[in-house]
């Protein structure tokens, strides 16, 4: 990575530090209700337990009866049968939450899946299924609950990934990266459109934390391994398969628990000044490559055209964006009214 990108990346990483909300919910916020999809395991479950312990009320979306039963045992949690690909379950969840009379302050669109396949050997049915959960699921949930969120002038938090920024550097992750890039674009546009209603929208971009998405991905790969034959990426996919077999056999992730992600979700939901994006990684390397990728794409866009910026002009633009982010100035595109 060129020296300028490394230096700028280090500066940018510091800008992403969090100021978590206090450990206990403020009295005025206690019992505010939020909906978390995909709350049976991983980031969703961790966040549901943390928010409930701090006095918020959590509607926890889950698909399986045993998960619903387990979630209902947690104080300040009501489990909701909710498959984000099933419109009838979404409609029923809306009616249930409306009937509870608490209103709805926030949505955490957390449900997601990952399927590994190289782009030229992926199956269209897998791509459709992945987008049905990761993209259309976010769209369906947000659209269905938008009236309640507008009424409360609340929050929408979409769980994206560093994969929503990274692309082109990891074989077989293309479909997942496509879906998370879509979530990034959706979040940016939604934030713009909902601002006029007093609703704030954020994306969380977690790195590699312990979650159920990895084990689910591996179990799916193992189950389908006898039927999947690769021509161009056989060695790569065999290596992934062997790694998945070891992972499933051990049953334990070496990644840290998603406490930092839950803190970011809580900040986005309840802080007076939530950020639009929260890059949350367990180590500096994942932050560096994510910020570095953003700079790489910026420099590629700027390369050798009629309106390219010089290095000095790019740094000046970065300083201006930094000032806007800190609230020291407002954006001026230089366009006459």
Protein language model regions, located:
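Rossmann-fold cofactor-recognition segment
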Residues: 75-88
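Residue(s) in the substrate-gating loop at a strand-loop-helix junction
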Residues: 161
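C-terminal beta-strand-loop-alpha-helix "lid" module of Rossmann-like NAD(P)-dependent dehydrogenases
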Residues: 197-250
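Conserved NAD(P)H cofactor-binding loop of Rossmann-fold oxidoreductase domains
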Residues: 110-115
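Substrate-binding pocket helix/loop in short-chain dehydrogenase/reductase
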Residues: 118-119, 126-128
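Conserved glycine-rich cofactor-binding loop
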Residues: 40-41
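Active-site helix of classical SDR
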Residues: 142, 179
């Amino acid at each position: 990575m060129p020296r300028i990108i490394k230096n700028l990346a280090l500066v940018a990483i510091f800008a992403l530090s969090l100021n978590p909300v206090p450990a206990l919910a403020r009295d005025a916020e206690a019992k505010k209700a939020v909906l978390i999809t995909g709350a049976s395991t991983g980031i969703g479950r961790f966040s549901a337990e943390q928010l409930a312990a701090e006095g918020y009320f959590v509607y926890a979306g889950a698909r399986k009866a045993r998960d619903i039963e387990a979630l209902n045992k947690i104080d300040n949690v009501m489990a909701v049968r909710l498959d984000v690909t099933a419109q009838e379950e979404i409609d029923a969840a809306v009616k249930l939450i409306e009937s509870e009379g608490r209103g709805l302050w926030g949505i955490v669109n957390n449900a997601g899946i990952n399927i590994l396949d190289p782009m030229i050997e992926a199956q269209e049915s897998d791509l459709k299924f992945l987008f049905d959960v990761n993209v259309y699921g976010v769209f369906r949930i947000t659209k269905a609950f938008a009236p309640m969120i507008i009424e409360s002038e609340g929050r929408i938090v979409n769980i994206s990934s560093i994969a929503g920024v990274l692309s082109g550097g990891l074989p077989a992750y293309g479909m997942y990266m496509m879906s998370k890039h879509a979530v990034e674009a959706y979040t940016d546009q939604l934030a713009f459109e909902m601002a006029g209603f007093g609703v704030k929208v954020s994306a969380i971009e977690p790195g590699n934390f312990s979650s159920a998405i990895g084990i689910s991905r591996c179990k799916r790969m193992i189950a389908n391994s006898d039927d999947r034959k690769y021509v161009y990426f056989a060695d790569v996919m065999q290596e992934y398969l062997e790694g998945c077999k070891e992972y499933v056999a051990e049953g334990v992730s070496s990644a840290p628990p998603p406490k930092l992600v839950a803190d970011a979700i809580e900040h986005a939901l309840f802080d007076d000044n939530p950020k639009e994006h929260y890059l949350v990684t367990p180590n500096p390397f994942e932050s560096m490559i994510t910020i570095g990728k953003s700079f790489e794409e910026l420099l590629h866009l700027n390369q050798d055209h009629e309106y390219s910026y010089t290095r000095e002009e790019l740094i000046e633009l970065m300083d201006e964006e930094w000032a806007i982010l800190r609230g020291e100035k407002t954006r001026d595109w230089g366009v006459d009214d």
